[in-house]
Amino acid sequence: QQRVRRLSQRLRLEAETEAAGLNAKPGTKWLILSETWCGDAAQSLPVLAAVERASNGRIEARVLYRDENLDLMDQFLTNGGRSIPKVIQLDGSFAVTSDWGPRPAEAQELVQRIKSDPERAHTYSEELHKWYATDRQQAIQREVRELISRA
């Protein structure tokens, strides 16, 4: 939670991301499945919260604990796993329009590449943390803009 606070304080939305929030379809809803221990959530939740604020009420977000909502989580698996965070985007009629998560595509590819190498698999957490530190939530912002465009 300290990481979430720190990232929230220094986060600056790109103009394009702020505009995407402002131009989101009214009634857009995000159900975000997460857990407090999740490192990927610590990186993405500040961005999602900032976009919700920037949307002036066009996007309404709710965070749900994954482990208390496994029936929902099991409808949005990533490669067969309950990977989080997972954003489920709904329209004003509560129909699913899209989903996103658990991390940006580039980071997901990095994790898969590292985990597939037995000599490097134990370093995946450290390597992912370095990637996030270098990227500074830019990929998350790009992919959240894409998510909003599918509303």
Residue ranges of predicted features:
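Short beta-alpha junction loops
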Residues: 65-69
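Short glycine-rich or small-residue beta-strand-to-loop segments that form or flank ligand, phosphate
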Residues: 29-35
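Conserved redox-active cysteine motifs that mediate thiol-disulfide chemistry
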Residues: 36-43
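General small-molecule cofactor/ligand-binding pocket signal
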Residues: 60-64
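Non-globular targeting/processing and membrane-anchoring segments
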Residues: 1-28, 50-57, 73-83, 91, ...
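Conserved beta-strand and immediately adjacent loop positions that scaffold enzyme active sites
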Residues: 86
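Short, conserved acidic/polar surface loops in the N-terminal third of protein domains
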Residues: 43-44, 74
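Histidine-anchored nucleotide/phosphate-binding helix
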Residues: 45-49
